């Protein structure tokens, strides 16, 4: 087998893989231009890449455009894979600087000879970041470029504009050799027309369509009209996550959450929730047990605040049964009831009217008497020898018909009511203990 033909087949296969980005294990990024290549080929011709691949395992090698320009690298990359330079003219000084940067001494004399073969009169072209824009009338395939002339079948002003500004069609990988020119010439004109009409998909498929630029710079008035109508129809209901109330605007929801933060409501909310961008943008409320319970508590608090003046005029009091008081823990410190709420629980108890917090139940009860203009009377709860009576002392106004000499509390005494104010019902006790 001929060694020369074997090497030629190998180079052609590697170059084809580079063109379509297939089986390439390396990407060289120069600015915003990306080149697919093989590590072995780059390391064989450049000591710069050889040292990088030895000490680095990254698949993307980033190079600054100030070190080597994309058109110079594309020129040298084509020589590495084909052994011959593309039909284009590059600046000789910049070419030498790029070769010195890559430490590709072997490519120095080849690139110089190839650059001197073509004179500026034979090929007049401009290379911009690897995209070749040709001014000739025939199809020319360059580095990373496929220039096609506008089809003659087009009529009208659009045909004239496309004739002055030919469209650009790029392959999947930047870099095509001259071997594919015959295949590109065989493509029918209908496929070229379809390629002209397709919009750009990625960075590697840039197009010089003046009409598309004009359409982008001057948007149609229909799009401007439909914009506000879409925003008006997309109004969302703002929902409080802590008590279940709904609001029409975000500002009302933010003011409502301030009441949670300040402690006016029995649900503690962190202050950072007020600075959230997605405040109140929630889905419709699920009718689960937690939401129903939260709404019930919030409506109860509002109802109690409205009925507050009526309670001050009443002389009678509702007794709190021992069965209700038994919900309170026997510990000296307040505990948390198992209410399965989603908000955070705190040890302190807050007043449902003004929001003040107290560490003990007795202090909270004394504070609630101040809202009614009455003085809290400690002496009305007589001390008993039994420890159970001492725990219930802050919630009792009087224990009637009990002898001071008795050493225990009988079952009849446990059935007697405790004279508390009417607000301390079962729901009020739950509200006081849970925050």
UniProtKB/Swiss-Prot annotation:
Biological process, per Gene Ontology: negative regulation of transcription by RNA polymerase II; regulation of cytokine production; regulation of immune system process
Compartments, record wording: Nucleus
Keyword Iron: no
Segments forming C2H2-type zinc fingers: 238-260, 349-371
Transmembrane keyword on record: no
Chief location of this protein within or outside the cell: nucleus
Gene Ontology cellular component annotations, sorted alphabetically: nucleoplasm
Start and end residues of each BTB domain: 1-107
Sorted UniProt keywords: DNA-binding, Isopeptide bond, Metal-binding, Nucleus, Repeat, Transcription, Transcription regulation, Ubl conjugation, Zinc, Zinc-finger
A Gene Ontology molecular function term of the record: DNA-binding transcription repressor activity, RNA polymerase II-specific
Gene3D superfamilies: Classic Zinc Finger, Potassium Channel Kv1.1, Chain A
Signal peptide: none
PANTHER family: ZINC FINGER AND BTB DOMAIN-CONTAINING 25 (PTHR24394:SF51), ZINC FINGER PROTEIN (PTHR24394)
The protein's name in its UniProt record: Zinc finger and BTB domain-containing protein 25
